[in-house]
A protein has these predicted regions:
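Single conserved hydrophobic/aromatic residue that forms the stacking wall/gate
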Residues: 1-9
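A short alpha->loop->secondary-structure connector
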Residues: 8-12, 30
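Active-site histidine-anchored catalytic micro-motif
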Residues: 13-19
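Internal, active-site/partner-interface "lid" segment
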Residues: 30-76
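Long, charge-rich low-complexity segments
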Residues: 63-78, 218-227, 231
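Long, charge-rich alpha-helical interaction segments
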Residues: 71-111
Length: 236
């Protein structure tokens, strides 16, 4: 008898992670006795970005590992690690089966990433506080005059400016040929009414409801940024 996979998936729209859908569908803890409860909870939290203010600024355990392995954190821009992030992820698939987070964080390839992450954390925080400007519900982080953009988890801007429900990162494109506006909604205050993908599409970019980017000519950057600010403020 053919199982009704599609109906189960459709009824799991509110599942916190894709992994949880698969885990539950195939029998949960009985089918996967080696998968710990805390690891599944960590996967749910990461996939749905349900991090607290403190977990963003002071990550530990599974939360820290998530930030380390997220390419958007940017650690790879500053060091040639012994193994690539991709290879480490492949290795961790095997290692996570039989080890807890305490053991995982002691692995040499993980330790070197932890050291670099916290080395950058203070600098990244200071940089964000210096380069950010608040426009009502929006915080704009303009990094175009920064020689070095320090590594940080992608949610730090929301923890530093909790009064804002959406952000724009202004950065140079490749070789400063154009300007990039990367826009995303806060995970701490999910009240933003802007459809980010649709807004970015108006300026040749794209994305989805909660995040998106557009690239514009440098001589149009300030005009476009002003328009983005006005629309986002109007949306609330």
């Amino acid at each position: 008898e053919e199982s009704d996979w599609s109906s189960d998936v459709c009824s799991s729209d509110l599942a916190p992670s894709a992994a949880r859908v698969v885990y539950d569908y195939y029998g949960g803890a009985k089918a996967f006795p080696n998968i710990s409860t805390d690891m599944m909870e960590a996967v749910d939290k990461a996939d749905s970005a349900q991090f607290s203010h403190d977990e963003i600024l002071n990550p530990t355990d599974w939360v820290l590992l998530n930030y380390l392995m997220d390419s958007r954190t940017g650690l790879g821009r500053f060091r040639e690690f012994r193994v690539s992030n991709y290879q480490l992820m492949m290795d961790l698939i095997q290692y996570c089966r039989n080890h807890g987070i305490a053991d995982i964080l002691k692995l040499p390839d993980v330790v070197e990433r932890i050291d670099l992450y916290f080395e950058h954390a203070t600098k990244a925080r200071a940089q964000m506080e210096r380069c950010a400007k608040v426009y009502k519900n929006l915080v704009v982080l303009d990094l175009r005059n920064e020689e070095t953009i320090f590594a940080a988890n992608r949610f730090m801007i929301y923890a530093l400016f909790p009064q804002c429900n959406i952000s724009i990162h202004a950065m140079w494109g490749v070789q400063k040929q154009n300007t990039v506006f990367a826009t995303g909604k806060s995970i701490l205050d999910r009240s933003s009414k802007t459809n980010v993908g649709e807004l970015m599409l108006e300026y040749g970019g794209g994305g989805h409801n909660a995040a998106g980017t557009c690239q514009v000519e440098n001589d149009q950057a300030e005009e476009v940024l002003g328009a983005l600010i006005n629309q986002i403020n109007s949306d609330g």
